Amino acid sequence: MDMVEALQWRYATKEFDAQKVVPAEKVEKIKQAFNLTPTSYGLQPLHLAIIHNNDLKQKLLAHSYGQKQVITASHILVICIETQIDSHFIEKNFELQKQVRVVEDNVIASFRDFLIKDFTNRTDQEIYQWAMNQAYLALGNLLTVCAAEKIDACPMEGFEAGKYDEILKLNEKGLKTAVVLPVGYRSEHDKFAGMKKVRRPLEETVFEVTV
């Protein structure tokens, strides 16, 4: 299956087969794909919480507006954002760059200082929105990887983020819930599985600029 075929195959799964579990090796691929998600400036203000425990799923269901995907999916992926994105966070990222790429401080100092100044001048809301944008980059990446691996998924924005934070103890880790992605395998009873994919015609959404 090529990538376009995989994207044609996928859909927002509304009913998972609760008896089917995503194998550990595929979960590992999901982890790796998440960590390889490109982010603005390469700062990677993201974490991925993976929930397989049924008791936790049941608790999350109570704050997911009754969306049964939360309990029938094999795993629940919760993309989280850092709550403290400041000079220390940026400096820590650049220290990692120095270690991995074996570069001297003077090579990256000007860009690091630019970013520290830029983020210092941003409001908390601007930084929050920037981090949320990165979370959606990760979501798109995970949806594509799941499709390529023939894993069904359903992106969810309908949930009480504060309650998710509380149940998963994200505040203790300096994190907030951004978006939720149940993954697993579609139920044969999911009425949406056989429906044709609806997209606007390509000529309406894509155009070339020649001048």
Question: Would you name each region that the model predicts?
Answer:
Residues 1-211:
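Acidic, surface-exposed loops and disordered segments
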